[in-house]
Every structure is written in C-alpha cells, then in structure tokens.
C-alpha cells in the first residue's frame, strides 16, 4: 500500500509544526550563550520562539540537547512537565533546548555544551558521551524500556504516486531505480538505513552471504551519497535527484504535517526498530545540582501524556497503552528486529562501519 502524505498527517496531528526537520541549531545555541531569565529559548535554524514559563521566585534551570525532528514534540511536552513540577514541588523550572543533527549535538556536548539531559538519535551517540566520561556506565538501565523513549522504522519515500512502483526492499535493486541515502560512515541515521537493508535478508530467512550481495546490489543503484540526512533530503526534495529516499518514517510523517504532498512512501513489513535513547548527563547534573529535576524530566518522557505527543509527530510510542491507541495509524510490521539482535552497537560498528569493514568494501566495489 502506498501512503499519501496528506492523509497520514491528518490522523496524527491537527496543527502543523513550524520548523524544518533538518535545521540544525547547535551552533546558534552556543553563539547565543547560556544566560536565561524568565523565558525558554527554542533554537531552530534562524527561527527563535520564546515561551514564558517562569515568573520569578526560586527556579531551577536544565538544558535538553536533542536532534532536530523531536522539537515539535518537546514544544508540547516541556510546558506540561513544567506545570507538573510547579504543582508538585512549588518550584519554577526553566528548560533550555538545543536541536540539531545527532552527531553534531554529541560532539557539542563532549566539547562543553552543558547538557543535563541528552535525547539523541541512536545509542551509539550516547555511548560516545559516556566514553568521554560525562555519563556513567549503565545509563541504559536508569530509565524504563532500556532508556528508549521513541521508536520509528525505515520508510521508502518515493515521488508522488510512486511511479517506479517501489514497495519492497527487493524493488530497490531493480534496474533503473535511483536511490538517495546518506553515507553511513558520516551519518548516524544512514546506519539505520544500512542495517535495515542487511536485516531485510538476514531477518527474513537469508544468510549473511546473501545479505552482502543484496546490499551491494542496492548501493549500485545509489546515485548520491550525501554526508548527512539534511543533505540527502535536499538532494531528493530540492534537487530532484533519485526515485526513492531512504528515510525515517517519523520524518516522512512530519514533512506531511508541514504540507509536503508531492511524495508518497512505503514501509516494508520487515524492518528495524529505530530506537531513540535518553540519558541524564551525570557529570553535569552533579556539578550543577540538577539531578532531581533532570531525572524527573526523563521519567516524564515515558508517561502516556508525553508519549502521545511523540506519536503525534510520527514516532511509534514505547508506552504500551499509547501504542495500542494508535496501532491502526501506522503500517503493520510483521518482522521487527533491533540493533541488539544484530549484536549491539559496538559489534555493529566494528563489523559494518569501521575503516576497512563491510561498508568500506561495498564502497570499494562501486568505484
């Protein structure tokens, strides 16, 4: 079944977010400095939005660092948490936010961006912050659901009406099909795409030899391999390159909510669970004395109230009750697998993406 953008957007959200899902703002955040009084800055590209959340009295300030497409959900979630904390603790909370590409946000935190909470696109980025000594080992066990707050899957985004009839993974290797995907050596999101292609074989009755051949064949049809998700989307949308873009389902839905109607999409029924983790940055919260409110905010992200907001912008909720509420709103996945079932991020990185690993060999064969 080919999904039309406008119809998908209608059931998930009635109001359209007002930002580009690919705008990065970490540089703007750093340039703006860290001072704040009674307002909540929300940085997204050149656009800034402020929301009054503190009117004097004692207050506590924390900083959330996340990746771009989560912004629409947090705009709804944060005021609800602020109100809840005020009611229960009698304390004003100011939550500063920084949004951008997950990889660039990771580097910014390691380089000194004083995040109290990080909610990044993949656990590998969170592990890099852990390895830098800012997050304690075992962070995955500090929150429910293995500290995963959002899920998505890989979608095949095509031109309107799907003229090339690209509906399954196997359609990607047809002669004449032109594919756009970011480079998994430089893009965290593209690693999910690559693993989805690999699992399309190994999690569907095939072996690794067959998987290697299939992924090789797919990349022979890749016409452009940009460094990140933003550039791959620009290549597909703005430059008109390719017949199909490998993308996150939630990003496709978010684009629909922003009025993008000239493309369609398919969700293969064998797919990888794209998992977005959250963690408290231990070194920073202990230094600033913000652990209590930071941990409470993380806990709040798992509530039905917060999970519904994530669902509205296209994420598949991790809360069981909310997932049941919206189960008919998303295409059904018959075989859903995780990075854990592929050996975990450390093993995956070594096997596929390190220098000289499988992806480099595939690239060598394309030259």
Place the predicted regions along the sequence by residue.
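Bacterial N-terminal signal peptides that target proteins for export
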Residues: 4-29
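Bacterial N-terminal signal peptides
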Residues: 25-41
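Early extracytoplasmic/lumenal segment of secretory-pathway proteins
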Residues: 44-132, 142-143, 248, 367
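A conserved helix-loop-strand patch within extracytoplasmic ligand-binding domains
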Residues: 50, 56, 130-203
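Extracellular/periplasmic juxtamembrane helices and adjacent flexible linkers that interface
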Residues: 55-56, 285-367
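Alpha-to-beta junction loops
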Residues: 112-118, 177, 239-244
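A bilobed periplasmic-binding-protein/Venus flytrap-type ligand-binding module shared by bacterial periplasmic
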Residues: 153-162, 275-292, 309-312
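Ligand-binding pocket segment of bilobal, Venus flytrap-like solute-binding proteins
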Residues: 204-269
